Amino acid sequence: MEGSLVQSAIAPTIYRRSGTARFRVRARATMMRTMPTRTLTLGGFQGLRQTNFLDSRSVIKRDFGSIVASQISRPRGLGSRGVVRAMFERFTEKAIKVIMLAQEEARRLGHNFVGTEQILLGLIGEGTGIAAKVLKSMGINLKDARVEVEKIIGRGSGFVAVEIPFTPRAKRVLELSLEEARQLGHNYIGSEHLLLGLLREGEGVAARVLESLGADPNNIRTQVIRMVGESTEAVGAGVGGGSSGQKMPTLEEYGTNLTKLAEEGKLDPVVGRQDQIERVTQILGRRTKNNPCLIGEPGVGKTAIAEGLAQRISNGDVPETIEGKKVITLDMGLLVAGTKYRGEFEERLKKLMEEIKQNDDIILFIDEVHTLIGAGAAEGAIDAANILKPALARGELQCIGATTLDEYRKHIEKDPALERRFQPVKVPEPTVDETIQILRGLRERYELHHKLRYTDDSLIAAAQLSYQYISDRFLPDKAIDLIDEAGSRVRLRHAQLPDEAKELDKELRQVTKDKNEAVRGQDFEKAGELRDREMELKAQITAIIDKSKEMVKAETESGEVGPLVTEADIQHIVSSWTGIPVEKVSSDESDRLLKMEETLHTRIIGQDEAVKAISRAIRRARVGLKNPNRPIASFIFSGPTGVGKSELAKALAAYYFGSEEAMIRLDMSEFMERHTVSKLIGSPPGYVGYTEGGQLTEAVRRRPYTVVLFDEIEKAHPDVFNMMLQILEDGRLTDSKGRTVDFKNTLLIMTSNVGSSVIEKGGRKIGFDLDYDEKDTSYNRIKSLVTEELKQYFRPEFLNRLDEMIVFRQLTKLEVKEIADIMLKEVFDRLKAKDIDLQVTEKFRDRVVDEGYNPSYGARPLRRAIMRLLEDSLAEKMLAGEVKEGDSAIVDVDSEGKVIVLNGGSGVPEPLAPALSV
């Protein structure tokens, strides 16, 4: 009883702490081992009860090893307990967890023992160890194993002592696991060794369970040995085979042999990069400091160069200096992982270096070599870089590093002692033509993976479109990603059910639903009929799918092309990534582009020159005739206030880009002071807002295909114009973090009131007045005068980069009347939402135009006139209850010029139909 209580209380505690304070647990167990167990004695009541957990908590301290050892050693006497305890001190956390899960399984089944079957269930239930992974890969899961165990041995009586002994066969398994660990050269016992011991035992319930689940013990053993890095032959000799340890256990645990992968054909082919591979080979042939460091932007193919070297070595296409060598890539994350105590990381690294020194044919490849700086460093410890420095300098360690330019500058250049040990090899971004060759080399691998074909045009389009439209990444990485995703898209599209199978599948779901309802309603005759129909539908669907598969197979075997990835698929992926339409122009879109002027004129009255210029620019860009290194177009709209400069930009955004919100609008009156200019590209380092990015650059990075409106450009600080020079000329701008933002797919519109005084005068000279009939001559004169004013205000290098300077005309009274119709229609639409039908008379419309027409102020006075004459009068009537929901109202002007609102009745002039947009 006493021992039972101690086990149930202490064993889980030891297990929980073993992960973080293993040394402390062992020390405590050693110290407490000799302390006696006392029984509670009371005067007159001797032997009333034994000590329970609460009585003995401060006295009894037992570790996991002593608890399990007591169960194993009990039949053999006390002599062997020290040996068994020593064995259990070698158990890893996962092995301890397996034993404890085995005890839990015994309790669950109501058994008073832990046998081989419970150990097997514990191995499966642990879930993360090598043993669990191997069993899972063999298709063995915990649920099925539990069912088989219950079939074979059944359930127990239900009463289980807290202290559960091991069966003799289970003890034998634990002893065999120790032998397996010794044969593998391991000084610990993990879950994999327990599984090998279980397989070595070969008899018992666990073996029967594995047999009934269809698992082959030899296959399981082979898989376990492969996963722990040992070949089958090394352990195949069994018990008498001796212990032939690994030659390079640390390297095989923390590294991957690229040369072996190249021999097995598991690496992608490396196309080009001959110069870089030759330079790496030259540096590796040096006597000292023979450590090349590949430096390049992310995605240009630095790792591929190391793989290319491994492929050359496996093919024998290398000079004798590195012939027969192995390229092993080191996983720094795995090397650091799990080093809880001081010195563990350094010990691993020193073992690694010793193994490399003993084997002259090892070339170490460290991807992201900057992770050496600071790796494993703690208070008072030295990092990996400083441990490796002496070996790197003396040539004892051949190492290829790879890192980006930024990381090299940030980490390695700061440490000159480390920098001099590495010889930099620059890896430039390949050109578009080189990228096309790389894609052709990789084509076969991606065709096999996606089970389709790539056309030559699709590969060329991937290289060209990724270079043109995806500006924040590098070739060939972005082009490879394009063909990969396009292949996935085409495969998914062809993997869908045929149309006839879809219809049958829909009917099948309905039949299944009806059958279940019939069963619930106990209408078994109907349920039987529906079941027959269900089976018939399933057979039909299977036949259709098999037929389509056979057709595809026949096409493939006959040499006919299966699913094809075309240029259109690549264009679709680029559009989905960037939001820039790069697909071929459809017939519907052609009509929209050709009728663009008409559509824009429904919102913009007059201003033909501006509308035509905008439409021409969009058409030019959409068919691909624009200069690829400049923005779509850049305009400056100059003219008096209220004539539609900003409205035209809004109309364009709403019509072509989807909504007015698709436009990036910057009010330049916010950038009047010098210190506010930095808001466009982001605050410099050390200032508030540095991490947030610029208002302009961040907006364009998120939406590269849009209209950018710089409203009231003349109000901005002159430094803004200096910043805009490179946007207008090269279509690019660098933000405060050094990232290049691409403006090549933006339409830049700047509005200005410069020259409005000249326009107001109508271009008249002293003593001359031009008639309205001569408006074209007048407009040309006004345009030249406004251009002169713009030249006086803006620098010539700024104006010279603009595509066009468009001068807006003043609005005539007729145009103001058309604008009034548009504004009145907006009011009608708002009232329709309130279920009120509104009409206005011709008199009222004339009154609005008379009050709202002012050539100097454009259409804005019209808005105020409608607000005062119509909205105010109507609001009063609605509040007074004279106009309610469901009513129709007519707005008119009486003989005195006052506005009157009438419920749609008689005695009023014939109303004007609601104003429609023209």
Swiss-Prot record:
Domain UVR: 505-540
Clp R domain sequence ranges: 88-230
Span list, region II: 565-756
SMART domains: AAA, ClpB_D2-small
Pfam families, per database record: AAA, AAA_2, AAA_lid_9, Clp_N, ClpB_D2-small
PROSITE patterns given in the database record: CLP_R, CLPAB_1, CLPAB_2, UVR
Keyword terms: ATP-binding, Chaperone, Chloroplast, Nucleotide-binding, Plastid, Repeat, Transit peptide
GO CC terms, sorted: chloroplast
Gene3D superfamilies: 1.10.8.60, Clp, N-terminal domain (1.10.1780.10), P-loop containing nucleotide triphosphate hydrolases (3.40.50.300), UVR domain (4.10.860.10)
Domain of life: Eukaryota
Annotated GO MF terms: ATP binding; ATP hydrolysis activity
Compartments in which it is found: Plastid, Chloroplast
Region of interest (Repeat 2), ranges: 166-230
Broad class of the protein's primary localization: plastid
Region (Repeat 1): 91-156
Family membership: Belongs to the ClpA/ClpB family. ClpC subfamily.
Job of this protein: Molecular chaperone that may interact with a ClpP-like protease involved in degradation of denatured proteins in the chloroplast.
PANTHER family: ATP-DEPENDENT CLP PROTEASE, CHAPERONE PROTEIN CLPC1, CHLOROPLASTIC-LIKE
Protein name per UniProt: Chaperone protein ClpC1, chloroplastic
Organism from which the protein derives: Oryza sativa subsp. japonica (Rice)
Gene that specifies this protein: CLPC1
